[in-house]
Amino acid sequence: MIGDEVPAVVIDIGSATCKAGIGGEEVPTAVLLSIAGRPKATSCSIGDDRKSIFIGDDIPKNRYRALFQLRHIIERGMITDWEAMEKLWREMYFNELRVLPQEHNCLLSEAPLTPKADREKMIEVIFDVFNVPNFYVANQGVLSLYASGRLTGIALDIGDGVCHSVPVYEGYSLNHTILRIDLAGKEITDCLVKLMKETGNSFSTSAEREIVRDMKEKTCFVALDFDQAKKEAEQSS
């Protein structure tokens, strides 16, 4: 049995990034891209490393990136590549947090309206592969309200793959009132790719799309005054 004095591992999975840390800490210890890269060639070695799959930040960001077929491990809030997801969790436990899974309980967030079959698969991997002693899956919207010190309210979660509106009452999500829309950060990336194409710049491969996503995250912002922001952009161009 794991005593209460041993802090739990907290894992937050998302379409763009997955975060992990130790319960009670202010910020996550690890933030990894939710991306898996598989070599386009039969075998591919980067330096002295030879793998069949690269995870998150292990994927090269230089010219070698084009050698990989990139795929998001989580799409629209749902895990679509369980092999890569297992490797990402392994990376978090052993290389980022540097803790043994069997010595810590685990709290893992999940997207609202996650299918029962997906949750069962998640539990199977956590218990059978990582031997975690105790495991709890929590709604991301509920956890967001907890983080703000509230038990009742509406959590609006805008991610990279999906947006959710989650009404919460006394710490419980009202599942029959949850709203979901598959319009999120990914669509902004798609829009930027289209705008780039109109100016003669093509970003068609998965690696090139990641370049556009990186540009979006570093340069785009929400304009509090749209007209003023548009005017300033026209003057600087």
Stretches with model-predicted labels:
Residues 1-15, 19-30, 37-50, 57-162, ...:
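Nucleotide/phosphate-binding catalytic cleft detector across ATP-hydrolyzing
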